[in-house]
C-alpha cells in the first residue's frame, strides 16, 4: 500500500512555518548588528533591493522546484535531471552545518527560558551569569541535547502534525514577543558615565539613517556581501528548507 506523503494542510501553515524559518536568531541578533556596522539605512536599502530582486527570484525558484518535483531536498534536483543530484547534497549540507551552532544557541535559549520561568529572570540578570553557564562542563550540553531532542520529535511527527502544528502555536507568541521587545527598546533610555542620555529612538535613527562616512568601493562591496549573506539567512533560500 502506497504511503501518504506528509504535507501542509493549508497555506496558512506553510506561511507560518516559512516565517518561523526566517524570523530566527539570524534576524533578531545578526541583522541589527550588521545594520549598525554597515551604515544603518545604507545597509537597509541595499538589503531591500537584494530581497526584491535576487532574493525573490531564489525564493520563488525554491518553492517552484518543490511544487514541481514533490520531493525532499535531496531528491528534488535529481528528479529534474540526474546531473543536478549533487545540488541536493549541497542544500542538505548547509542546514547540517548551521545546526551545529543553532543547537548550541537553542540550548542557551532553553536555559534562559527555564531560569525566567523559575526565578523571574533575577538570576539570569546577575553579572557573569552567561559566562559561568557556557563555561560549565555539563549544563550547556544538557540543554543542547534537550533542544535537539525536542526538535527531532517535532520533525518526526511530520509536516502537518509536527512542523505546521507547532508553527501555529509558536509563531503568534513569537510575534507578540518581538512587538514587546520593539516597544521596550524604543522606550529605553540609558545614562552613561559622562552624563549623556541615550534613548531607543536615537538608536532607531542610527538604524534607519544612511551613513556614508568612509564609504569606498571596497567598503561598498563588504556591505553588499554582508547584505547578501543576511538575505540567505532571512529567506532560508538554497538551504533545502523552502
Model features per residue range: what roles?
Residues 1-29, 58-63, 67-79, 83-89:
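Membrane-interface "cap" regions at the ends of multi-pass membrane proteins
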Residues 2-6, 34-38, 71-90, 103-162, ...:
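Inter-helical loop and helix-membrane interface segments of multi-pass membrane transporters/permeases
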Residues 6, 35-61, 139-140:
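Extracellular loop-to-transmembrane helix junctions
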Residues 10-48, 240-242:
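Transmembrane helix-boundary motif of multi-pass solute transporters/channels
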Residues 16-22, 48-53, 90-101, 146-153, ...:
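Hydrophobic alpha-helical transmembrane segments of multi-pass membrane proteins
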Residues 26, 51-63, 67, 73-74, ...:
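Central hydrophobic cores of alpha-helical transmembrane segments in multi-pass inner-membrane proteins
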Residues 40-47, 82-100, 164-175:
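Alpha-helical transmembrane segments and their helix-start/interface "positive-inside/aromatic belt" motifs
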Residues 49, 53, 57, 169-190, ...:
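Selective recognition of specific alpha-helical transmembrane segments in multi-pass small-molecule
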Amino acid at each position: 500500500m502506497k504511503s501518504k506523503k506528509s504535507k501542509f494542510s493549508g497555506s496558512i501553515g506553510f506561511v507560518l512555518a516559512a516565517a518561523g524559518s526566517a524570523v530566527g536568531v539570524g534576524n533578531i541578533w545578526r541583522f541589527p548588528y550588521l545594520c549598525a556596522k554597515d551604515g544603518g539605512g545604507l545597509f537597509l536599502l541595499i538589503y531591500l533591493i537584494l530581497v526584491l530582486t535576487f532574493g525573490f527570484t531564489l525564493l520563488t525558484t525554491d518553492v517552484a522546484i518543490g511544487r514541481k518535483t514533490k520531493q525532499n531536498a535531496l531528491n528534488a534536483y535529481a528528479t529534474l535531471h540526474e546531473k543536478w543530484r549533487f545540488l541536493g547534497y549541497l542544500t542538505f549540507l548547509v542546514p547540517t552545518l548551521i545546526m551545529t551552532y543553532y543547537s548550541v544557541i537553542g540550548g542557551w535559549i532553553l536555559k534562559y527560558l527555564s531560569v525566567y520561568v523559575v526565578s523571574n529572570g533575577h538570576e539570569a540578570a546577575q553579572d557573569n551569569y552567561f559566562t559561568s553557564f557556557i563555561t560549565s562542563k555539563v549544563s550547556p550540553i544538557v540543554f543542547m541535547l534537550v533542544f535537539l531532542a525536542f526538535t527531532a520529535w517535532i520533525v518526526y511527527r511530520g509536516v502537518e502534525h509536527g512542523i505546521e502544528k507547532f508553527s501555529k502555536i509558536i509563531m503568534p507568541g513569537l510575534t507578540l514577543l518581538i512587538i514587546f521587545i520593539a516597544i521596550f527598546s524604543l522606550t529605553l533610555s540609558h545614562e552613561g558615565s559622562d552624563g549623556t542620555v541615550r534613548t531607543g529612538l536615537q538608536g532607531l535613527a542610527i538604524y534607519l539613517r544612511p551613513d556614508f562616512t568612509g564609504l569606498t568601493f571596497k567598503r561598498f562591496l563588504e556591505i553588499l556581501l554582508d547584505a547578501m549573506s543576511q538575505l540567505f539567512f532571512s529567506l532560508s533560500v538554497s538551504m533545502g528548507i523552502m
